[in-house]
UniProtKB/Swiss-Prot annotation:
This is Protein VHS2. Present with 2200 molecules/cell in log phase SD medium. The modification Phosphoserine is found at residues 53, 61, 102, 172, 299, 301, 303, 325. GO terms for biological process: cellular bud neck septin ring organization; cellular response to heat; establishment or maintenance of actin cytoskeleton polarity. Residues 7-21 have a biased composition (Basic and acidic residues). The gene is VHS2.
Amino acid sequence: MDTSNHNQDHDSHVAAQRENDNNYMPPSPSMSESSMIFERNVEDPSYLYKTVSNNAANSLSRQSSRTSLFNHNNSSNRNFHNLSQRSSAVNLHLQPSRTNESIASYQTYNPDFVVQTPLDHRRTLENFVPPALDAGCSIVTDDTTGLDDVDMVYSRRPSTIGLDRALGRTRSLSSQSFDNETSPAHPRSPNDHGSRLLRFYSYADMLSDDNNNNVSNATSTSSTANPLRRPPMQGHYSFSSSLLNSPSHLPSPPSASASPPQHMNFTNPFIISRRYSNTTINNANGGTSAGSTTGAALSRSPSNQQYLLKQQRSPSGSARSRRNSNRPGSAANIMIGKPKSKFHMESSGSEGFSSEEEDNTMIERDKLNLKQKLQSQLAQPPSIANMVNDNHNNTNKHKNTINNNIKNSPAFTNSNPSSKSNSNSTITSMNPDTTK
């Protein structure tokens, strides 16, 4: 008897469970609204699911739902496989949402209702992900994709310099001509060599393209240029830019015979005025010759600078500068003791990227240029030097003629013994009374 009763209870329990499975109800909208607060902002309207039963006439109704929490917990493990098989036959269609009155009446009518979420519940999210991030994530998550199979288009600016270094590539694929960059790019199809295409376009690239267009427009209409327009970024510092790889943009080593080009540097006007004011004060105190002052005053023009460089290279000019430096009152002894500073700044589109080695090179170059210009300024012009040499030769000739005349003329002695004049004197007294 006990076994028969137990079997009957088991059969009735299985039949009730099958009836509950056939009379499955969709989830309540009220429960989904309370549990999906954040998802509601990015999801489409909720879909109500309706299972297909073997008996199509057996429609869903509120009265036929007899699901309880106890029965659901006991039968969830046994019917998991059956639910997964029936999930493939689910029809998805949009149902009109229930009103608040119907929800309230249903909850009061059937308080034992329990929400069951189907296993095939899918949410359709809106696509707010950027394409570059989406493509990058798909490549990272794909185990079969290699970096050699991905065609990456790098940026020309330092915003992606970390990516270039991480991949071990010194030059990017975008360091091509400007015409190729501005032309519309057609990405290759996936069938071409089986590679993907990723493009990186940074904010610095956008500014660079804008400035290049502004520069091209400004060259055509230079007379009507806007003074408020920002300067171009042609010399922008970038490892991947092909402009800096040219020899013209590389810093040249310092040399004593060659001076830096005129268009690559400029002289600070405040230091110039201070230097020339110091030289005028030294000249007023009684120090220098007229040739050095004229050389210092005329050394501003480019023609005089070329002349001073020629005088420096010639051996005669170096000898004259050595001779003038040996004088006690020369300007070389005054100015070498207190060297004047002079700075040269190379024109570049971006500041703050120069290394310490370049700064030291520029300082050494400035010292050499300053020393050369000081020596060339102290060298006298050829006209003044010739005049000084001619005067010196004339004085020597005059002294020689006087000495010859003295040797050839007879000597006269003084008759007055009390006279203290020398017997070898060139001028003797003819009258003995005049010595008294």
